Amino acid sequence: MYTSKQPFLKSKQPFRKSKQPFRKSKQPFRKFKKPFRKSKQPFRRRPRIGPGDRIDYRNMSLINRFISEQGKILSRRINRLTLKQQRLITLAIKQARILSFLPFRNYENEKQFQAQSISIITGSRPRKNRHIPQLTEKYNSNRNLRNNNRNLSSDC
């Protein structure tokens, strides 16, 4: 029997591992009626640039697909192009702009965009009240005290 005065004695029998695994059942953890299988062919979007399309500043039908309504070059994430394709498209757009095939900005759409944004801003923005508040009695009295103190100090 173990008492508080006696030291703890280790048992002389070695620790034996159980021969049974932790989980007694041999069935898998989750049993689905239909096992989940990944499709063999992954879903792929059709590339925006076909194999026959030439990326060139004269190919306006191709270039117009990669420009926003305001005339800006769309990002690679939006275009879903490879780095090489995006670089070639960007160069072609810049060449077309310089050679005046393309405008630098699409002013028609930009004017509509500005008109909409201005109407939204002016409609919701509160106007600042620019009138000067009248001086209160407390403010006047404090100002008079300061003026009196200045006059007294200048008299000395």
UniProtKB/Swiss-Prot annotation:
InterPro entries: Ribosomal_bS18, Ribosomal_bS18_CS, Ribosomal_bS18_sf. SUPFAM superfamilies: Ribosomal protein S18. One of its GO terms (cellular component) is mitochondrial small ribosomal subunit. Residues 1-54 are annotated as: Disordered. PROSITE patterns: RIBOSOMAL_S18. One of its GO terms (molecular function) is structural constituent of ribosome. It is found in: Plastid, Chloroplast. Pfam families: Ribosomal_S18. It comes from the Eukaryota. Keywords: Chloroplast, Plastid, Ribonucleoprotein, Ribosomal protein, RNA-binding, rRNA-binding. GO terms for biological process: translation. Residues 13-48 have a biased composition (Basic residues). Part of the 30S ribosomal subunit. Belongs to the bacterial ribosomal protein bS18 family. This is Small ribosomal subunit protein bS18c.
